[in-house]
């Protein structure tokens, strides 16, 4: 198939292609880095259980909603709400999703650049080029941060210019199996090391006394970010779906892939932390586990250096390659959302749209590269608050504007007997009551 260069909408070549692309959007640093470190710092197996419940009971219903809106409209998040309703407010909701995606991508690419740099640091450290290795691990060096972020953005732009099937789908079909293979290989190695089983027990044996309201809302926020909800990515990906596809089934596959890889990442990172502890590397600060950033960018590299030799270098390179692949799969979907908006609403062909939007985001990324203190504020505004707000308003759109009858009419494509199914009885309850209430409470809790 030729590369998509016109303003015509693309489509997925296969069901597997969509599942891998949507799962690739979901499986990013939030799964490989964020989820394991939150499990480790906020409740162990108790957090894992709450996260799984939030993902299936809140994340999955919203995912079905986003995909159905996308496929019914065949448009980007802004255009989707224009097509499906005359309501003037909800296109602004779609625009908010586009803005959130752009701003998340702007700081995400800086963090992704750190991971990419650390992969080379391991090689330079092994070769004795210590000064170069220290430069690559100095997150306070703005020029280095900017260079790595630009490299990451250029790779993302290049993939997006290829279109839906030849760019996004082809890239994720390669990266997802590679990602899973790397995780499993590293798990097998880590499990042979002293201290690993202590980490496994911490991860898999629940202590329900550690469940608190804060833990529940942290797990809910993690589920939202992990599944790429609320920013329009799944509306955009849904707009490329064939009418013959069963959306609830596809959403279930994507959710299972997301939690499955998050679980595997936890099975790698948490035992690795305790292997580091067994090797004499301090993983606690006082009574508290070190921060997530320290765990990934200080403690694990120290472990690889302690192992030393070819094995230590290989593990370090492979681990940070894993983070880089996970990040790239997410930056693809984050950039596709505003690119789709420009293509649909402004009728600019894909290649020009990708470069125009991509370079705009890159400029913001470079600013953040020199002011990394902005990352925390941007993450709070556009991720911690922005994504749940988007998800809440999507629920309200289906409940009060588009109505469930229209939603079910769309879902009947690919699932002809949906109105007779258990899903038809349960989904509206979650989408109208449980999901909005839980999400709203989560948003409010950020201000209390």
Language model: regions and residue ranges:
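Membrane-embedded translocation segments of transport machinery
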Residues: 2-8, 12, 16, 169, ...
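Transmembrane helix-boundary motif of multi-pass solute transporters/channels
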Residues: 14-54, 233-235, 249-252, 256-259
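Loop-to-transmembrane helix boundary motifs in multi-pass membrane proteins
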Residues: 17-19, 25, 142-147, 257-263, ...
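Transmembrane helix-loop boundary segments of multi-pass membrane transporters
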Residues: 34-51, 70, 85-86, 114, ...
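Hydrophobic alpha-helical segments of multi-pass membrane transport proteins
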Residues: 324-334, 354-364, 382-411
């Amino acid at each position: 198939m030729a590369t998509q260069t016109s303003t015509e909408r693309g489509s997925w070549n296969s069901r597997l292609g969509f599942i891998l692309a949507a799962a690739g959007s979901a499986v990013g640093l939030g799964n490989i880095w964020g989820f394991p470190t939150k499990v480790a710092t906020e409740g162990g197996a108790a957090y894992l259980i709450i996260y799984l419940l939030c993902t299936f009971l809140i994340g999955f219903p919203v995912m079905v909603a986003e995909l159905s809106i996308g496929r019914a409209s065949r448009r980007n998040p802004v255009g989707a709400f224009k097509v499906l309703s005359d309501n003037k407010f909800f296109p602004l909701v779609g625009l908010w999703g586009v803005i959130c995606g752009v701003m998340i991508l702007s700081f995400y690419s800086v963090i992704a650049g750190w991971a990419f740099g650390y992969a080379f640091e391991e090689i330079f450290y092994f070769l004795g080029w210590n000064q170069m290795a220290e430069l690559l691990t100095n997150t306070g060096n703005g020029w280095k941060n900017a260079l790595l972020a630009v490299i990451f953005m250029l790779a993302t732009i290049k993939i997006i210019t290829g279109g839906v099937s030849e760019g996004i789908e082809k890239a994720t079909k390669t990266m997802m199996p590679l990602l899973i293979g790397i995780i499993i290989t590293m798990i097998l190695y880590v499990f042979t090391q002293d201290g690993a089983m202590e980490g496994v027990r911490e991860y898999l044996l629940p202590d329900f006394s550690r469940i608190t309201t804060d833990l529940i809302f942290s797990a809910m926020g993690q589920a939202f970010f992990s599944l790429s909800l609320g920013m329009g990515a799944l509306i955009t990906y849904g707009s490329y779906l064939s009418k013959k596809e069963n959306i609830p089934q596809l959403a279930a596959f994507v959710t299972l892939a997301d939690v499955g890889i998050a679980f595997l990442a936890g099975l790698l990172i948490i035992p690795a932390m305790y292997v580091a502890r067994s090797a004499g590397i301090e993983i606690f600060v006082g009574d508290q586990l070190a921060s997530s950033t320290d765990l990934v960018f200080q403690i694990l590299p120290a472990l690889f250096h302690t192992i030393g030799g070819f094995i230590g270098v290989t593990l370090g390179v492979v681990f940070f390659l894993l983070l880089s692949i996970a990040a790239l799969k997410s930056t693809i979907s984050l950039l596709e959302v505003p690119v789709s908006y420009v293509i649909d609403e402004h009728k600019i062909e894909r290649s020009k749209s990708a470069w125009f939007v991509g370079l705009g985001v890159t400029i913001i990324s470079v600013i953040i590269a020199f002011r990394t203190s902005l990352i925390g504020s941007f993450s709070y505004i556009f991720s911690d608050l922005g994504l749940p707000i988007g998800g809440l308003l999507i629920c309200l759109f289906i409940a009060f504007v588009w109505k469930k009858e229209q939603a079910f009419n769309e879902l009947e494509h690919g699932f002809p007997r949906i109105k007779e199914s258990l899903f038809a009885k349960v989904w509206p309850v979650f989408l109208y009551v449980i999901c909005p209430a839980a999400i709203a409470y989560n948003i409010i809790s950020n201000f209390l």
